[in-house]
């Protein structure tokens, strides 16, 4: 069985990478038992609550991250240093995550067979 890690490292509205990544996760959730999401660097901005992408004529896919619970995708990690660099805390995020430091995040990534970045 493939263990897949999805790494979000781009901001939410500068490209379609975040939306495409989320779509891919939801589409493949039935085929892979062990999946985890990692949010690093600008990727932590994917999860910031109370975004209004329609004001910049962007599609609001951010709220679809709430679907992860319905798909039983519970392994969700956010880089602590990335949160701090953006002046954010766990309370600013849309979904429940585990906040880990960069070293722990790197160790977690080693458990996965495939890494897909968005």
From Swiss-Prot:
Residue pairs linked by disulfide bridges in the UniProt entry: none
Known role: Could be part of a sulfur-relay system.
Gene3D superfamilies recorded: DsrEFH-like (3.40.1260.10)
InterPro entries, sorted: DsrEFH-like (IPR027396), Sulphur_relay_DsrE/F-like (IPR003787), Sulphur_relay_TusC/DsrF (IPR017462)
Localization per record: Cytoplasm
Family affiliation: Belongs to the DsrF/TusC family.
Species of origin: Vibrio cholerae serotype O1 (strain ATCC 39315 / El Tor Inaba N16961)
Cellular component aspect of the GO annotation: cytoplasm
Claim: Cell cycle is one of the keywords in the record: no
Keyword hit for Cytoplasm: yes
Protein known as: Protein TusC homolog
Pfam families noted in UniProt: DsrE
UniProtKB keywords: Cytoplasm
